[in-house]
């Protein structure tokens, strides 16, 4: 009798994706982040569902409903902080996942890579709308500032902003629709993640060497299931340490002040995971230019496959490209720091230099260095 795991239409899909999947024998811990992102997504959907049971998306009661969750709901505080800090863990895993893709040339699977970029945009939109929901000062002013950026679009900008707001300012209608979108988007993300996996399994996984591994495959289970469980354990331990010891470490104290349209906070800034893009936005004095730079800071990933000039796929054996990659990482950390600083000297200049360097590395230096490496190897 054949195994039901391999014959039943439903279990066959699971079997071919997570059990009998042929995987390269040499993929490192950097390949753990896909499964960790899946765990983050499930965790966010579950905690979010329980929060939505007690949350009210009305400007008069939103702030107090979050307070009510933390004070009166059974284990409400842990659900709320797991959701808030879970978003931070989600973005840490996302950035490391994208970084891995850049380092090892995973972008040479264009379909998987492009779906990944769409996923990144969708997750960023979801996180932004979620940040608005507690209706604190930073929620309100963050929503006002970021949605206002769309007014930079020529001709239709102002109408577009008012259409998104549902009025002439961020108000009740805005909060209600942001809650609706914040609820539905994670399910769209789940569908996109399934498509992401579908495209990945068409080609098979890349590996650190960047060399095809068809001649040397091992089954996903037990080798990589146990490896993923170890990664998941690290993720949960880190998250729970954050939640139980310093839940407000990554948040903004201003968000504990109820939203007040008549009082602007001294420094409006988004959550830490958007600071690099926010710094790029602020480094351009022109509004439309800043918005374009903001979008391009993520969209630039889409043309990375076209700029791949090296004859090797991975950076594993390319020390010059490795130096550039780590310079890019340092540059992104610098941008993150600048995004949280006030708009004054010397932070403005540092931000502008870091922004220029970011695009220069990705669009100019990487392709040039790759050609230089080809010549050094006499290829």
From Swiss-Prot:
Signal sequence coordinates: none
This protein's record includes keyword Iron: yes
Binding site residues for heme b b562: 83, 182
InterPro entries for this protein: Cyt_b/b6_C, Cyt_b/b6_C_sf, Cyt_b/b6_N, Cytb/b6-like_sf, Cytochrome_b, Cytochrome_b_C_euk/bac, Cytochrome_b_N_euk/bac, Di-haem_cyt_TM
Binding site for heme b b566: 97, 196
Keywords noted in UniProt: Electron transport, Heme, Iron, Membrane, Metal-binding, Mitochondrion, Mitochondrion inner membrane, Respiratory chain, Transmembrane, Transmembrane helix, Transport, Ubiquinone
Cellular localisation: Mitochondrion inner membrane
Main localisation: mitochondrion
Entry's Gene Ontology cellular component terms: mitochondrial inner membrane; respiratory chain complex III
Membrane topology type: Multi-pass membrane protein
Free-text comment on the cofactor: Binds 2 heme b groups non-covalently.
Binding site for a ubiquinone: 201
Source domain of life: Eukaryota
TM ranges: 33-53, 77-98, 113-133, 178-198, 226-246, 288-308, 320-340, 347-367
Subunit structure, interactors included: The cytochrome bc1 complex contains 11 subunits: 3 respiratory subunits (MT-CYB, CYC1 and UQCRFS1), 2 core proteins (UQCRC1 and UQCRC2) and 6 low-molecular weight proteins (UQCRH/QCR6, UQCRB/QCR7, UQCRQ/QCR8, UQCR10/QCR9, UQCR11/QCR10 and a cleavage product of UQCRFS1). This cytochrome bc1 complex then forms a dimer.
Extra remark: Heme 1 (or BL or b562) is low-potential and absorbs at about 562 nm, and heme 2 (or BH or b566) is high-potential and absorbs at about 566 nm.
Family statement drawn from the similarity comment of this UniProt entry: Belongs to the cytochrome b family.
Function noted in UniProt: Component of the ubiquinol-cytochrome c reductase complex (complex III or cytochrome b-c1 complex) that is part of the mitochondrial respiratory chain. The b-c1 complex mediates electron transfer from ubiquinol to cytochrome c. Contributes to the generation of a proton gradient across the mitochondrial membrane that is then used for ATP synthesis.
Name of the protein in question: Cytochrome b
Native organism: Ictonyx striatus (Striped polecat)
Gene field: MT-CYB
């Amino acid at each position: 009798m054949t195994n039901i795991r391999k014959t039943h239409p439903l279990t066959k899909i699971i079997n071919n994706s997570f059990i009998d999947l042929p995987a390269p024998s040499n993929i490192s811990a950097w390949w753990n982040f896909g499964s960790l992102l899946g765990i983050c997504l499930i965790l966010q959907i579950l905690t979010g569902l329980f929060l939505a049971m007690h949350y009210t998306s009305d400007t008069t009661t939103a702030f107090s409903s979050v307070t009510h969750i933390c004070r009166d709901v059974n284990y409400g505080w842990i659900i709320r902080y797991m959701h808030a800090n879970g978003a931070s863990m989600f973005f840490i895993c996302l950035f490391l996942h994208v970084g891995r893709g850049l380092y090892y040339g995973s972008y040479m699977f264009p379909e998987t890579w492009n779906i990944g970029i769409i996923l990144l945009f969708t997750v960023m939109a979801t996180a932004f709308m979620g940040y608005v929901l507690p209706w604190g000062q930073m929620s309100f002013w963050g929503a006002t500032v970021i949605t206002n950026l769309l007014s930079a679009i020529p001709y239709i900008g102002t109408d577009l902003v008012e259409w998104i707001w549902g009025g002439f300012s961020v108000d009740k209608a805005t909060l209600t629709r942001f809650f609706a979108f914040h609820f539905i988007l994670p399910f769209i993300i789940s569908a996109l993640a399934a498509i992401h996996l579908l495209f990945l399994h068409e080609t098979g996984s890349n590996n650190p060497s960047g060399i095809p591994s068809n001649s040397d495959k091992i089954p996903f289970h037990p080798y990589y299931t146990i490896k993923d469980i170890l990664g998941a354990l690290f993720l949960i331990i880190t998250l729970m340490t954050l939640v139980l010891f310093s839940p407000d470490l990554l948040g903004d104290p201003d968000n504990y002040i109820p939203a007040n349209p008549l009082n602007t906070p001294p420094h409006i800034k988004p959550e830490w995971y958007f600071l690099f893009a926010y710094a790029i936005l602020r480094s351009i004095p022109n509004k439309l230019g800043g918005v374009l730079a903001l979008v391009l800071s993520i969209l630039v990933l889409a043309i990375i496959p076209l700029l791949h000039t090296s004859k090797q796929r991975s950076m594993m054996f390319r020390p010059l490209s490795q130096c550039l990659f780590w310079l890019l990482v340092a540059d992104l950390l610098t941008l993150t720091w600048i995004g949280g600083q006030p708009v004054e000297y010397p932070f403005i200049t540092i931000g502008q230099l870091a922004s220029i360097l970011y695009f220069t590395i990705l669009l100019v230096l990487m392709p040039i260095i790759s050609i230089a490496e080809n010549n050094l190897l006499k290829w």
